[in-house]
Amino acid sequence: SNLEIINFLQRVGLDTYKDKPARLLSGGEQQRLSLARALLINPSLLLLDEPTTNLDPYSLNLIEEIILDENKKGKTIILTTHDMGQAKRLAKEILFFDKGKLLEQTKAINFFTKPKTKEAQSYINGKILL
């Protein structure tokens, strides 16, 4: 319904843009609109691939808050990120891949405090392995 659409636009901070074509929105606004569209159908699983890449701080924080809120409501969220800070803030469990191979699957707290592989340790610390 129109009311649901307006509610989702409010949630992502775009309610005043309801009549503006998506192509005229900034990158951050388009990301927020994409998330609103995905949430509108109320999926049980949400797949997000780098949802905050190149976003302004306002959009980044808003999207992270929505992700946390949806997870608290019981929604399963699979998030791809290279941002270790974001992974720390949002993840309950980490699947760490390197060169397409799964190297670790563990609770987020364990990943950041006791990584099992040198690749994970290096990535967490921002070092490059040769």
Tell me what each language-model feature is.
Residues 21-25, 29:
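Conserved ABC ATPase signature
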Residues 35:
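Hydrophobic anchor residue at the start of the ABC signature
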Residues 46-49:
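Catalytic Walker B motif of ABC-type/P-loop ATPase nucleotide-binding domains
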Residues 81-82:
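H-loop/switch region of ABC-family ATPase nucleotide-binding domains
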